[in-house]
Amino acid sequence: MTDTAASPAVRDVVAALDRRYPRAWAESWDRVGLVLGEPDAAVRRVLCVVDCVPETVEQALEARADLIVAHHPLLLKPVSSIAPDTYKGRIIHRLIRSDVALYCAHTNADVADPGVSDALAGRLGLTALRPLVPATGAAAGEGRGTGRIGELPATMTLGELTGFVASRLPGTTSGVRSAGDPERPVRTLAVCGGAGDAFLPDARRAGVDAYLCADLRHHPVSEHLADGGPALLDAAHWATERPWLDDVAAWLRGQFDIDVLVSELDTDPWTGHARAVPDLPETKEIQP
């Protein structure tokens, strides 16, 4: 790593990230780009995270990072105050006082090529990738769009694929669950990093064998399967987006002579999981 005089400024790193993930590619409701930080401040170390939360902020401070690159926006919804006694206000004040800049790439990174779903597909060894939902205005064959469709290294049953996905993604309390016939053969798989039930119709139209995403809900899943859609796999939101951190970190290292770290902190909010077992003998009654 070079000295401070030769280090890039925040504006340089932001400009590079904006070229890779243009802000114009973000959804209209999204909030991406530089959230806070002095554009002229030197960047010697970057921490890549899925969520900018108090725990990852403390990681950044302990690592002496100058910039946090986050996937999820800190200020996605309007706030009326960033006073230090509010949740987001505390984060903002902590970062500003510590001279740590914050940059977010969200839906613009989702549709990029390579982007969030490419990283997820890479974890599973998918080949012959193509977008699940091509981006509006993307040139034919460009590869930009939401989600990816690819071929698994070998045909697996849905049950086998569920275990395979769980073994390839970062471990979380939520794990991986599947919907459909466990013996159904799967070779062509669609994936989408993050919440993906909005694209259930696209997965069905694409004719894939199964679709992996996060945050699937009861009624959309039930109706999708009843309508003859592909099998489904549901993983933790954080776990499906965490692979992208490795990709963006490697790219940043290639662009600048700086240290780039990846947070391994699981920011999935779920901390417990128990599988209900029917007809347990001798179940102990819990007194109120």
Predicted regions and their residues:
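Hydrophobic structural segments
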Residues: 1-288
